[in-house]
Amino acid sequence: MVAVEFKVSESGRPRPEKNPKLGFFVYLLGSAAIIGGFLFGYDTSVVSAAMLYVPEAPGLKPMGTVWKEVIVSITPGMAAVGAWFSGAGSDRYGRKPIIIGSTLIFVCGAVICAVAWTKIVMLIGRIFLGVGIGFASMVVPVYLGEASPTHVRGTLVSAFAMMISFGQVVANIMGGVFSYWEPYTIGWRLMFAFAGIPALIQFVCFIFLPETPRWLYENGHTEQAEQVLEKIYGGNTEWIEYELAEIKTYAEERQKQMEEEKKSGPVIWRILKTPHVLKACFIGSMLQAFQQLAGINTILYYTADIIRSAGIENYHTIIWISVILSICNLIGPFAPMFFIEKLGRRKLFLFSCAGVVVSLVLIGVSFLLVGNDSAPNFDRSAYLLAGNYQSNGEAESCLMLSNCDSCVTSEHCGFCEDSETRTGFCLPVDHNDVTLYSSTGLCTNGLDKSNSSFPNATSYVWQKHHCTTSYTILPIVMMGVYLLTFSCGFTSLPWVLNSEFYPMWARSTCVSISTLSNWVFNLIIALTYLSLTHAITKYGAFWLYAIFTIIAFIFIYFLVPETTGYSIDEVEMLFMNKRQRNIAMQARQAKLDAASDKDKNSSTSLSTETITM
C-alpha cells in the first residue's frame, strides 16, 4: 500500500512555504514548558539515591520492604490518577491553569518530602509529586502542540521527552552532590528540595505566558487567540491566517464529533462497537503494558539498591555509578531519531526487544554468579559454639539460609561475616539499627566482635545490604546494556505507535486508555520489585521480566503492523479484516474522486476568470 502525500492542510489552505522567524517569546514558551519534563524525570528518579539514606533517617526508621515499595511506587500510582483527570480539567479550565497548578503541586511535594519527619509525611509528599507528574505528563505536550509554531512543534514535544531523561541524570548528579552533606539528616532532604527550584521557575514563567490559541478560540475568545498567534508568529500575517484557519477547521470537526457522540453515545461505546478500532486500542494498550513489564522502572527507581546488592559498599560510589547508567538512558533515544524512518517501527522495536531480553537474562545470570560467590552461612552447630546465642524464631529462620546473598535479600536478616575468611552467620537484624547490628550473635551492639575461641575468627563485619563478591562489575555492565537497548526503541515506540494507530474520532480516548495502561503497570512493577526479590531471588525477578519481554517480542511480531510511510487512513485499514478494508477503500476512493472533481471545477472557474480579465 502506498502512502498518500497531502500538499495542503486539513483546512484546505496551502501551508506557507517560508517558515516564520523564531522570536524570544517562542524560546521562552518552549523553555518554560519543557521544565515539566525535567520535573517528571527528576522526581521519579531522585528516590533511587534518597532511599539509600531515608530508611535510616531519624524519625523514619525502621522502614521495612513494604514501606520502601509504597514510598517509591505511590508517585507513579498517583501520576496515573493525575493524568486521568488532567485532560478533562485542561479542556474546561485551560492548559495554562493546569500547568501552573502542577508547578505549585511540585513545590508542595518537594517541600513536604524535604521536611518529612515521619513515614506518613514522606508518603504525603510523594503523593503530591505523583499528581504533579500526572498533570505535567498529559498537559505540557498538549500546550506545546497548541502554542508553538507549526514547524517546531515536533522538536519541542521531542525536547519534552528528552528532558525527562535529562531530569533523571540530574537527579542522580544532585544525589551524588548532596550525599556528602550529612546524608542521613540533611543530604537526602536537599535531594528532594532541589526539585522546588525549577518548579518555581516554571511557575513564574507561566504567569507571563498566555493560554493556547486553540483553547481560546474553542472557548469563544477569538480576539485573544489572534493576539497570542501574533506573538507566536512575530506578526507574520500569512502564518497567522493559516493557523487560524487550521484552528477553525479543527473546532468545526470537534463540534461534529460532539454531535455524533450525542447520536451514537460516548466515544468509548463507539470504540467497543468498532472491531478494528477496539483491536488497535488493545494492541496499543498491551504495548504500553509490555514497556513496564520489561522492568524499566525497576532499573530506574531502584538503581542504587540494585548496584548495592551487586556488591558496592560505598554509597557515594553507588550514586555516581547511577549517574553513568542514567546517561546510558539519555543517549539511547537518539537512535530512533536516525533509524526509525529507515528501518521502520517493527524492525527497530523487535531489535530493541531482543536486546532487552538478552540483557535481562544476563543481569539474572550475573546475580546468580554473585549469589553463588557470596560467603557461605555456617550451620547452626557452629553458631552455638561462637557464643552470645539467643534462640528465637527469627534467628532460626535466618540460620536456615544458605549464603550471604540469600541472607541480605531478606529484610529480617543480615550477614555477620568474618572479614578474613569470608565465612559467617546469617543473623536477625537489630530493629533499632538494622544497618549496624544483629539482634543476637557476634554482631550485636556493644559486643567485641573478636572471638579467639572460634576457629579462624578475628573480626566480624555486619553486612545488611550487600555481600563481598568477585562478580560485582557484571550486573552493573549488563544494566548499562539493558538501558541502551531499551531506550533505543522500547522507550519511544509504544508512544509513537499509539499516536498513529487510531482514527481522529477515537484518538484521544484510545491514547488515554493506553496511557492509563502504562501507569497502572508502572505502579505494579514499582510496588512489587523488592517483594519479588524476596520471593524468587534477584536473578529470578530479572528472568521473569525477560519472560514478559519474550512474550512482548512474539506479540509485536505477529500483531503489530508496520506503519512507516502510511497515512492515518491507511494505518486504520491495517487493523481491519478483508471485508472491512474493501468497504473503507471504496469510501476513501469516492471521497478522493469528489475532491478531484472539486479541484477541476475550481481550475475551470479560475481559467474562465483569467480569460474574462
Swiss-Prot record:
Region annotation Disordered: where it falls in the sequence: 594-613
Segments passing through the bilayer: 22-42, 70-90, 97-117, 120-140, 158-178, 190-210, 280-300, 318-338, 348-368, 473-493, 516-536, 540-560
Residues in compartment: Cytoplasmic: 1-21, 91-96, 141-157, 211-279, 339-347, 494-515, 561-613
The entry's keywords: Cell membrane, Glycoprotein, Membrane, Transmembrane, Transmembrane helix, Transport
Biased composition (Polar residues): 602-613
Keyword Membrane: yes
Extracellular side: 43-69, 118-119, 179-189, 301-317, 369-472, 537-539
Tissue expression summary: Expressed in the excretory canal cell and in pairs of amphid and sheath glia.
SUPFAM superfamilies tied to this protein: MFS general substrate transporter
A GO term from the CC aspect: perikaryon
Reactions this protein catalyses: myo-inositol(out) + H(+)(out) = myo-inositol(in) + H(+)(in)
Function: H(+)-myo-inositol cotransporter. Probably by promoting the transport of myo-inositol regulates intracellular osmosis in response to hyperosmotic stress.
Family: Belongs to the major facilitator superfamily. Sugar transporter (TC 2.A.1.1) family.
Protein name: Proton myo-inositol cotransporter hmit-1.2
Gene from which this protein is expressed: hmit-1.2
